[in-house]
């Protein structure tokens, strides 16, 4: 969220609103149109029969709030900016919109979806393929850390949708392995991360190569003003579906903190929790890759079965670890913020922030794992003296109260 807070200060949610007004000024109403139609069921949305079959087979019964308002405008071909918290079915919203509009008789890339991490791109690929199963959709994920030749071979054979990370997608466009001629839909997922300084230039480069008349969808959990500002350059009369600040409360997830006197005592606190609680699956977040390795080693020496994943590991190793965690053969995953957005594990009941995130907005991506699609979850934050300011910032940012962990925590899981 660079540029929102003065250097050296913590993020203040009030600056978000002031900055957005300043950026958009009096043109705000002209640039955005709010979209307020609500559909209480998937059947009422006018979707293809085989898409509905895929949606129900995937396990959806009733559309979430973002799906009730977000699927239809995308299906109508409108440019859309949609904001909803992590775990609310955002991915299925744009996947449904894409799948509804594809011409399946034309085996050419018609939709391009960009995501900030390999894990998230692969997760989107899985959702797109599952929802489009009865439609015969061909989807491919172009991500770094995989074979360029294999990407070229699959793209040459023909796909309807490409999901990928900006670097590899731009490489495929540059090599002309991915031909943009038939692309009519362009989606940015996790736009807050995508449009951060690291990816902005690559996204511009990709956008320049796409056909001029293209539908653009921007989907994100948080929507910093710089993301809104940049979308002005890409989008034509977009409709906006933004969650009001007061609504971003991560409903259904109970949030607690534990005061820990010293950093060195966090390990004892963690082990005590695992000895007293019956936990099905949990994710533990720390702030550095080195700490992932350190904590994994310490937990294993105390006979706790844990898995670990971070950005220094090669893609194949990370895939194997995530597969084990999804299948339940590993119950505890230790990781960093880098991979928070790619973890989609339905049975996660507990998220532990061993370290509080360094940015308030990352808190959402971390604990949004623990109560996906209405499943209840618990988030526990370890807080040392130096963290008190950040805990206060997080509570103000999301308009939530995080209470001290009660003695009867076992009853909550």
Curated annotation (Swiss-Prot):
Keyword Cytoplasm: no
Helicase C-terminal domain ranges (all copies): 252-413
Chain ranges for the short sequence motif Q motif as given in the UniProt record: 40-68
Any coiled-coil regions, as ranges: none
Substrates-to-products reaction catalysed: ATP + H2O = ADP + phosphate + H(+)
Keyword field: ATP-binding, Helicase, Hydrolase, Initiation factor, Nucleotide-binding, Protein biosynthesis, RNA-binding
Residues where ATP binds: 84-91
SUPFAM superfamilies given in the database record: P-loop containing nucleoside triphosphate hydrolases
GO cellular component, one term: cytoplasmic stress granule
InterPro entries listed in its UniProt record: DEAD/DEAH_box_helicase_dom, Helicase_ATP-bd, Helicase_C-like, P-loop_NTPase, RNA-helicase_DEAD-box_CS, RNA_helicase_DEAD_Q_motif
PANTHER family for the chain: ATP-DEPENDENT RNA HELICASE DBP3
Family: Belongs to the DEAD box helicase family. eIF4A subfamily.
Function, in words: ATP-dependent RNA helicase which is a subunit of the eIF4F complex involved in cap recognition and is required for mRNA binding to ribosome. In the current model of translation initiation, eIF4A unwinds RNA secondary structures in the 5'-UTR of mRNAs which is necessary to allow efficient binding of the small ribosomal subunit, and subsequent scanning for the initiator codon.
Protein name from the UniProt record: Eukaryotic initiation factor 4A-7
Species of the source: Nicotiana tabacum
């Amino acid at each position: 969220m660079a540029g929102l807070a003065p250097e050296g200060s913590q993020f203040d949610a009030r600056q978000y609103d002031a900055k957005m007004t300043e950026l958009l000024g009096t043109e705000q109403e002209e640039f955005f149109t709010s979209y307020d139609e609500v559909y209480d069921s998937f059947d009422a949305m006018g979707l293809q029969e085989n898409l509905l079959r895929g949606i129900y087979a995937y396990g959806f019964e009733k559309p979430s709030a973002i799906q009730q308002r977000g699927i239809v405008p995308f299906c109508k071909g409108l440019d859309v900016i949609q904001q909803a918290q992590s775990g609310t079915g955002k991915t299925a919203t744009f996947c449904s919109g894409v799948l509804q509009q594809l011409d399946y008789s034309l085996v050419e890339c018609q939709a391009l979806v960009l995501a900030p991490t390999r894990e998230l791109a692969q997760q989107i690929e899985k959702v797109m393929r599952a929802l489009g199963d009865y439609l015969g959709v061909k989807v491919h994920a172009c991500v770094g850390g995989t074979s360029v030749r294999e990407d070229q071979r699959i793209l040459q054979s023909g796909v309807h949708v490409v999901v990928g990370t900006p670097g590899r997608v731009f490489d495929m466009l540059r090599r002309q392995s991915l031909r943009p001629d038939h692309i009519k839909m362009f989606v940015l997922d996790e736009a807050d991360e995508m449009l951060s300084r690291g990816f902005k230039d690559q996204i511009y480069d990709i956008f320049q190569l796409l056909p001029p008349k293209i539908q653009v969808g921007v989907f994100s959990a948080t929507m910093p003003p710089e993301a809104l500002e940049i979308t002005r350059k890409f989008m034509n009369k977009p409709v906006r579906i933004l969650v009001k600040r007061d609504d971003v409360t991560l409903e259904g997830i109970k949030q607690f903190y534990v005061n820990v006197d010293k950093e060195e005592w966090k390990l004892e606190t963690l082990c005590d929790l695992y000895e007293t609680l019956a936990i099905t699956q949990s994710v533990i977040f720390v702030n550095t890759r080195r700490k992932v390795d350190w904590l994994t080693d310490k937990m294993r020496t105390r006979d706790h079965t844990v898995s670990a994943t971070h950005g220094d590991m090669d893609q194949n190793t990370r895939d194997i670890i995530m597969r084990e965690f999804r299948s339940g053969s590993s119950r505890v995953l230790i990781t960093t913020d880098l991979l928070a957005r790619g973890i989609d594990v339905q049975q996660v009941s507990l998220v532990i922030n061993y370290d509080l995130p360094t940015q308030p907005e990352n808190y959402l991506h971390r604990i949004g794992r623990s109560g996906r699609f209405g499943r209840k979850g618990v988030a526990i934050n370890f807080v040392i003296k130096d963290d008190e300011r950040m805990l206060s910032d997080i509570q103000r940012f999301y308009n939530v109260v995080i209470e001290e962990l009660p003695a009867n925590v076992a009853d909550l899981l």
